Amino acid sequence: MRVLAVDTSTPAGSLAVLESDRVLGVVSTWVEETYSSRLFRHLEFLLRELRIELPQFDLYAVAAGPGSFTGLRVGLTAVKGWAEVHGKPIAAVSGLQAVASQAHATEPLLVPVIDARRGQIYGGMYERRGGRLERRGDEVVMTLEEFLALLPAEAAGARLAFVTPTPELIAAAVARSEFFRCPVETVSAVLAPIIGRLGLAQAERGELVDSLALDAHYIRRSDAELLWRG
């Protein structure tokens, strides 16, 4: 299965092309330039280099959030359009899951953290079950200190590891918290290849959507009140 993976949820946006589990090409830039101006330019470059055309993809995988409203809107709108025109399915993938999926840590609980800017973070918790990661509760946006204060109740004494592309953002606060013994693992901010692989896994489980059903996973500040319910 040939996959085009798109991530516009963070400043380190990326595109990747996969043939089954094999990554054929990746484009990523971390620049102060809007996604609306660079996404299609980078896509054109990647497809030209690989000599592939949009109709030749079997699946589009896209980061559906959490992330900036503007960035997510650009990526999701593009994927919606391609899927509708070419009649292809979509895998909507969590960016936090893509971060957690890169971890080499052996702890049963993984806590991915992404910079949400303005003094806040996006955070969540994933549990290893049967060779895959399953989300434990809701993904949230709040200050790091608030997030760390809420973790003990959900972790319930289980070992956990923090996973993030920006360790400098959380390392000091973790060291001052009751989780000071927990590892902080650094992973890549380039998420498109991982999003592609997670999208393939979702396709195998039949967890796909069409262009009409695709929606962004925006997290509002008030969602903090719903932390890990459900």
Regions found by a protein language model. Name each.
Residues 20-23, 76-86, 128-131:
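A glycine- and small-aliphatic-rich helix-loop capping segment at beta-alpha/alpha-beta transitions
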Residues 36, 40-43, 79, 96, ...:
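A general structural signal for well-ordered alpha-helical segments in protein cores
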Residues 1-66, 189:
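N-terminal beta-alpha supersecondary unit
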